[in-house]
Amino acid sequence: MLSYYLRLASKSFRRTPGLTGLMICAIACGIGACIVTLTVYHAVSGNPIWWKNNVLYAVTMDSWDPTQPADSDNPTLPPPQLTYRDATYLMTSSIPKHKAIMTQLLGMLSGARGQRAPVPVMTRATTADFFPMFDVPFEFGGGWNAAADQGPGPVMVLSHTENEKLFGGANSVGQTLIWNGRQFRIIGVLKEWQPAPRFYDLNEGGGFSRTEDAYVPFNWAPTLQQMPSGHMDSWGTQSITNYQEFINSESNWIEMWVELPTAASRADMLAFMNSYWAEQRKAGRFQRPINNHLTNVGDWLKVNHVVSADNSILLRLAFAFLAVCLINTIGILLAKFLKRSAVTGLLRALGASRRQIFWQHLVEVGAIAAAGATAGVVVGIIGLKAVQALYDTGNSDFGGSNYAALAHFDPVGIAWALGLAALSTVAAGLYPAWTIGRLPPSRYLKSQ
């Protein structure tokens, strides 16, 4: 019977190609809009390191101005970064399995013998545990050790993109580069690694900046007396005339993350932070109420509002648009089926059951759904390509955004799109198919 119903559907399409094409276009536009917004929303709202969500924690302490909160919109939250003195002290704790402090620096990178002109590169100054703690994948070599942190050692890890630029993707471990006037030996090259959102530093680009081009031990920042190029907050009227005064100031510019695999280690780390807070309060700092936090990745993304209200509104609008398209499709299907009511009445008079009439029209709806799904996937791909083109300015250059990387089509997305298209269209076609199946045949036979 299915093949017979398909033949009837094919004849129906040929009789009304305009209406059929209109329904397919309506479904395709609605599905395409949903694909684009759902894909981007899923990317920005996802947890890029979900498997370690309950063991990785951002460390925050409220050393801010006692007369006002760090964020007037969220007065209960401490600053998202730490001061230099607080970060370096907390790094002395042996409680975490892994711990890392970090900031963003601007570096000038060139070849060791002048064979490459200096180019600006965004650099992550961090500590050795950054790589194992965040499961950063290496293509060649690896990260540095604790001794290089203390030195600091003249070692560097390159990103996949930067290694492609400088060495054509070849194994560059052991090569030497000049970074900010100092020679650095490459000890590792990353695989392509673009966590979205960039959870470990949400202060730049709302968490959607690309990862850095190079990574060096954190202590190179104070050794070279280099100011951070990333986000920095300060308060008060303190005068800062040199680098030593800067690192001793109440300026917040360092992110800190710890890996705490057990509830006991989390409690111990928080107790360590509270004890330090009490000591500093006696010394005249931390005059605000105690507000120390260990925040896991998922909660960190929420409190920093990574998914903006605009994204949620766009998602709702896209589904509303799909609903409008489906309502229009229902109207067209109903008009089309009712126009053939005389034929349907004749079939009923000849012995066709309501169920058979229902399934005949539902198969026709399913064929339209399949065509609409296919066209919707095409529209969705075109839409995602448009988003990539819109945000692909400087995507692989200094300071580039990672928004374009979010708009990618994956097999799971295709499966969801096809399922969404088929189910929504068939659901929309149930009412017209049910209506035509319940029409009394005598009424239409008498009119002929």
Give residue ranges: language-model regions.
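Intracellular coupling helices
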Residues: 6-18, 327-368, 438-439, 443-447
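Small-residue-rich transmembrane alpha-helices
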Residues: 366-438
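Membrane-helix entry/capping segments
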Residues: 1-4, 11, 15, 19, ...
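Short, strongly hydrophobic transmembrane alpha-helices
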Residues: 16-50
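Generic structural signal for small/hydrophobic residues in well-ordered secondary structure
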Residues: 13-16, 35, 44, 58-61, ...
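Structured, solvent-exposed hinge/loop segments at the ends of secondary-structure elements
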Residues: 38-166, 170, 179-184, 195, ...
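Mid-to-C-terminal secondary-structure elements
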Residues: 128-143, 154-304
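Alpha-helical transmembrane segments of integral membrane proteins
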Residues: 19-33, 315-331, 364-376, 413-417, ...
